[in-house]
Amino acid sequence: MTTDTIVAQATAPGRGGVGIVRVSGPAAEQVAEIVLGKLPRVRYAEYLPFKDEQGQPLDQGIALLFKAPNSFTGEDVLELQGHGGPVIMDMLVRRILQIKGLRPARPGEFSERAFMNDKLDLAQAEAIADLIEASSEQAARSAMHSLQGQFSSKIQQLVESLIRLRIYVEAAIDFPDEEIDFLSDGKVAGDLYAIMAELDGVRSEAKQGALLREGMKVVIAGRPNAGKSSLLNALAGRESAIVTEIAGTTRDVLREHIHLDGMPLHIIDTAGLRDTLDKVEQIGIERAWAEIEQADRVLFMVDGTTTDAIDPREIWPEFVDRLPKDIGLTVVRNKADLTGEDLAPSQELGHAVYRISAKTELGLPALREHLKACMGFQGNTEGGFMARRRHLDALERAAERLLVAKDQLEIYVAGELVAEELRLAQESLSEITGEFSSDDLLGRIFSSFCIGK
């Protein structure tokens, strides 16, 4: 248990109708007596003045006192709900910090204390931040499911299955002289395959949850005047980029964040790529390449009125040579309203090819479906949970350990090695909920939270 008491504004900075200051720790009752002049009844809302050091009212509002362990943090907690002006909030926090033993809360420290006091696990704590940062209704619902423990429950079920299997395997190791060969009787293999299948299902759900949180970065690239900015505007549904007939109009990177069926898509329009003596345009082109090299997918825009080619290497071999091999490339032939070409998508020389008109939006629905498929979108995410990159990494490590355990069982019938791989898989899964996590990992996670959360 911590011995110090922390304070911070729990509501967002800025002006609002209501602002909340939260205090957590053993001195919460002392703060109440000093600032309120009395100890409020536990878990009852009382309308009281908030007093300065001279006993004069700073503000008046609702005071709520929670006693450990029945609070968000598991400690004594005092919440003061006053008027949400930034000056009032700052005065109230500074007044509380004058009390001996009080200090400002670090980012995420209230959630960290809730985790340390077993009020929620690590995945649930992260879900609080994800719920606040949700950029769509689907993302908010998924974060709420994680906060309610849906993701953690699935992980706990996997961990418990691994523990039961480990007990069985280790019993076979400890009693090798029994008439029955426990490692070869089919139970271990059957249970292991069932756990692997269950883990695959959780991994698939987690990938969808990570997509809801992180989305996909798509860069629109190509020669000047190919229609890149027009495509950005069409996908965004508004005039985000200036469009003219003058080559080189876009000189800097333009960003738009849209949602396709709830999945966030980060679209980036770049300067047209060409050799130029214009210093400003050169800077824009270098920035364009910096974005291209970090993309999840590149939409390679081609002016369909200038060439019939669909192979990007034929259109621009230097571009293909410079593009990192692990980045997906989609050829987008623009101005189909002028060329009259068939809009049917095709697969040519390892690249998807889409014919569109960014101006009239011909072919755009098919391109949107293609982008969803590139993200790995699997349809309705209702009932899913939110996941982060570290969760996917932990699930991947667990799956790798189980594959090794499968080989150790099937090829070598090595009980000790099977048990060790099961232990390592369990350890990886336990990192997700925080049952097995280093202090450094916890510090990185909670430091990314808002102050007051």
From Swiss-Prot:
Its EC number is 3.6.-.-. It is found in: Cytoplasm. One of its GO terms (cellular component) is cytosol. Coiled coil: none annotated. Residues 215-376 form the TrmE-type G domain. K(+) binds at N225, T244, I246, T249. Pfam families: MMR_HSR1, MnmE_helical, TrmE_N. It comes from Aeromonas salmonicida (strain A449). This is tRNA modification GTPase MnmE. Mg(2+) binds at S229, T250. HAMAP family: GTPase_MnmE. (6S)-5-formyl-5,6,7,8-tetrahydrofolate binds at R22, E79, K119, K453. Keywords: Cytoplasm, GTP-binding, Hydrolase, Magnesium, Metal-binding, Nucleotide-binding, Potassium, tRNA processing. Its cofactor is K(+). NCBIfam families: mnmE_trmE_thdF, PRK05291.1-3, small_GTP. GO terms for biological process: tRNA methylation; tRNA wobble uridine modification. Belongs to the TRAFAC class TrmE-Era-EngA-EngB-Septin-like GTPase superfamily. TrmE GTPase family. It comes from the Bacteria. Homodimer. Heterotetramer of two MnmE and two MnmG subunits.
